[in-house]
């Protein structure tokens, strides 16, 4: 018989920087999860992804055990890192803060494809390009 699921927790945590302080500690503590065990497992799994916030979905079971799934970093983080900007434009229609080439967009699509809601690479590229435009980054 499968374990009974008592909750699901969705968080975004900096890679290799999970610790018992908020927001991780309180979110896991409410469900009775061993916080340090999660932090060690998460930090180990996200080695090599430093500099990104990693979305994680934690499934908590009735016996207080847990499993977790890490996703790819948000598209905006990948776009900012590739374009070499700190943050998007405050007025994307007037102020352009960076540029991406079509090849760079396709590189982001390769990393993010599993988390997007399409299987078509061309459609995925349009999604990423739209996100970049809304941040004030031009796509050439």
Swiss-Prot record:
PROSITE patterns: RIBOSOMAL_L11. Forms part of the ribosomal stalk which helps the ribosome interact with GTP-bound translation factors. GO terms for molecular function: large ribosomal subunit rRNA binding; structural constituent of ribosome. One or more lysine residues are methylated. Signal peptide: none annotated. This is Large ribosomal subunit protein uL11. The gene is rplK. Belongs to the universal ribosomal protein uL11 family. GO terms for biological process: translation. Part of the ribosomal stalk of the 50S ribosomal subunit. Interacts with L10 and the large rRNA to form the base of the stalk. L10 forms an elongated spine to which L12 dimers bind in a sequential fashion forming a multimeric L10(L12)X complex. HAMAP family: Ribosomal_uL11. Keywords: Methylation, Ribonucleoprotein, Ribosomal protein, RNA-binding, rRNA-binding. The lineage of its organism: Bacteria, Pseudomonadati, Campylobacterota, Epsilonproteobacteria, Campylobacterales.
